């Protein structure tokens, strides 16, 4: 039994590619799952498709052939050529696959690290796969451990608490100045990476986001990826918008200011403007009740929280690594059980066969059969107790493979048992 994940996410694909790959339609997912499960090397499948990632999670017999099958099918449904998908895809096998799934479920691989929405999305994907018969015990085990891992990461760390990007720092400062942001409306000018991050952070705090961009179609696509409830406006409406709302976050790639003095009117309410762009998007404006913050004003928050976030991420990845090892340890115990069961069965069958021979030949009276059966049962249980205990004890050790293979050879047991152990060591790739 082997695990495989073929992953496309915000880390290795752009918006356009992810949009083409998206399997948000039920029929599309059904088509992909059905095709993959018809392949003899693929046993089970779970399909996760969100705005920021497409994860094909599989239990397979042959990872290489299964990967080819996945890329071929995704090429067919997306219209993207096979070679491009092959070049972009992140492929994870066995221990790496489990570590990746646990990290994703814990929010450590998200665009906004630590976000909680992904756990619910994975639960929905698992529920669909289970109900439609795409997955069974093998991937079910993975999912249950993934949710257990996610719960511990959230309860044992503060990974979501301290912002380390300019966008998250801007939202954090807005929260500091205004308190609860829930129900407020916020303008986000610019649909690039920084604008997307700001929008995601604002939504996570319960804000109503208005996303403003030059390319209306692109802006609509970005908004749809983040949250379907985001309102989209063209930049031509910017003057009216900036004079109507209290919160503004700007992060365009313009070389010149997009908000100038002549666009601004005095209002009776306080406005908080966060300029996240370099060069600055907002011209120097001295208007009453406008509180202006530039990148340099936000760096203090970012720097203050960076060490804290790194510590929390280290703790989170330790938890993930622990759960990966626990998963394989538990899995290996399950896989050793069939061998132990087979040895006990053979011992019992041999003892009972000899008893029947003895009764048939008259060496043992028939009326003693049940008593002798019980005696033999106790004898071979006592004899096998220590070897069974030792076999379970070494399941987590490197020598387990050799010992189990020797037992299988001597007893001529054909049961497939995969005991390869992996040391779970991953370097952190911290993103804000």
Swiss-Prot record:
SUPFAM superfamilies: Glutamyl tRNA-reductase catalytic, N-terminal domain, Glutamyl tRNA-reductase dimerization domain, NAD(P)-binding Rossmann-fold domains. NADP(+) binds at residues 190-195. The record marks 100 as: Important for activity. One of its GO terms (molecular function) is NADP binding. The active site is at residue 51. Disulfide bonds: none annotated. Keywords: NADP, Oxidoreductase, Porphyrin biosynthesis. Its EC number is 1.2.1.70. It catalyses: (S)-4-amino-5-oxopentanoate + tRNA(Glu) + NADP(+) = L-glutamyl-tRNA(Glu) + NADPH + H(+). Substrate binds at residues 50-53, 110, 115-117, 121. It is an enzyme of class 1 (oxidoreductase). Pathway: Porphyrin-containing compound metabolism; protoporphyrin-IX biosynthesis; 5-aminolevulinate from L-glutamyl-tRNA(Glu): step 1/2. InterPro entries: 4pyrrol_synth_GluRdtase, 4pyrrol_synth_GluRdtase_dimer, 4pyrrol_synth_GluRdtase_N, GluRdtase_CS, GluRdtase_dimer_dom_sf, GluRdtase_N_sf, NAD(P)-bd_dom_sf, Shikm_DH/Glu-tRNA_Rdtase. One of its GO terms (biological process) is protoporphyrinogen IX biosynthetic process from glutamate. Belongs to the glutamyl-tRNA reductase family. Homodimer. HAMAP family: Glu_tRNA_reductase. During catalysis, the active site Cys acts as a nucleophile attacking the alpha-carbonyl group of tRNA-bound glutamate with the formation of a thioester intermediate between enzyme and glutamate, and the concomitant release of tRNA(Glu). The thioester intermediate is finally reduced by direct hydride transfer from NADPH, to form the product GSA. Catalyzes the NADPH-dependent reduction of glutamyl-tRNA(Glu) to glutamate 1-semialdehyde (GSA). Possesses an unusual extended V-shaped dimeric structure with each monomer consisting of three distinct domains arranged along a curved 'spinal' alpha-helix. The N-terminal catalytic domain specifically recognizes the glutamate moiety of the substrate. The second domain is the NADPH-binding domain, and the third C-terminal domain is responsible for dimerization. This is Glutamyl-tRNA reductase. It comes from Nitratiruptor sp. (strain SB155-2).
């Amino acid at each position: 039994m082997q695990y495989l994940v073929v992953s496309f996410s915000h880390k290795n694909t752009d918006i356009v590619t992810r949009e083409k790959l998206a399997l948000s339609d039920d029929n599309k997912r059904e088509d992909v799952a059905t095709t993959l499960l018809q392949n003899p090397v693929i046993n089970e499948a779970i399909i996760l498709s969100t705005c920021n990632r497409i994860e094909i999670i599989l239990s397979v017999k042959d990872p290489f052939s299964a990967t080819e099958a996945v890329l071929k099918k995704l090429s067919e449904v997306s219209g993207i050529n096979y070679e491009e998908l092959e070049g972009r895809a992140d492929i994870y096998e066995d221990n790496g696959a489990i570590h990746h799934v646990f990290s994703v479920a814990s929010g450590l691989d998200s665009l906004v690290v630590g976000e909680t929405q992904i756990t619910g999305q994975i639960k929905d994907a698992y529920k669909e796969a289970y109900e439609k018969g795409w997955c069974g015990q093998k991937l079910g085990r993975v999912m249950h451990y993934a949710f257990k891992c996610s719960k511990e990461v959230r309860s044992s760390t503060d990974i979501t608490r301290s912002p380390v990007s300019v966008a998250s720092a801007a939202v954090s400062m807005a929260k500091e100045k205004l308190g609860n942001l829930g129900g407020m409306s916020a303008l986000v000018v610019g649909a690039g990476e920084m604008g997307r991050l700001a929008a995601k952070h604002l939504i996570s705090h319960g804000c109503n986001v208005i996303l403003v961009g030059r390319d209306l179609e692109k802006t609509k696509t970005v908004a749809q990826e983040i949250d379907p409830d985001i309102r989209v406006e063209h930049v031509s409406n910017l003057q009216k918008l900036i004079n109507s709302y209290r919160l503004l976050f700007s992060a365009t790639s313009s070389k010149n200011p997009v908000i100038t003095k002549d666009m601004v009117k005095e209002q009776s309410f306080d406005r908080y403007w966060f300029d996240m762009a370099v060069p600055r998007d907002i011209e120097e404006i001295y208007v009453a009740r406008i509180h202006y913050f530039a990148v340099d004003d936000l760096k203090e928050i970012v720097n203050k929280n960076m060490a804290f976030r790194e510590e929390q991420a280290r703790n989170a990845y330790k938890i993930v690594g622990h759960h990966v090892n626990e998963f394989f340890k538990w899995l290996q115990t399950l896989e050793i059980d069939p061998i132990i069961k087979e040895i006990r069965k053979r011992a019992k069958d041999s003892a009972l066969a000899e008893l029947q021979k003895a009764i048939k030949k008259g060496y043992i009276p028939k009326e003693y059969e049940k008593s002798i059966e019980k005696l033999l049962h106790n004898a071979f249980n006592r004899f096998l107790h220590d070897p069974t205990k030792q076999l379970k004890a070494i399941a987590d050790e490197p020598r387990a493979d050799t010992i189990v293979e020797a037992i299988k050879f001597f007893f001529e047991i054909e049961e497939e048992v995969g005991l390869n152990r992996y040391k779970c060591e991953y370097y952190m790739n911290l993103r804000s």
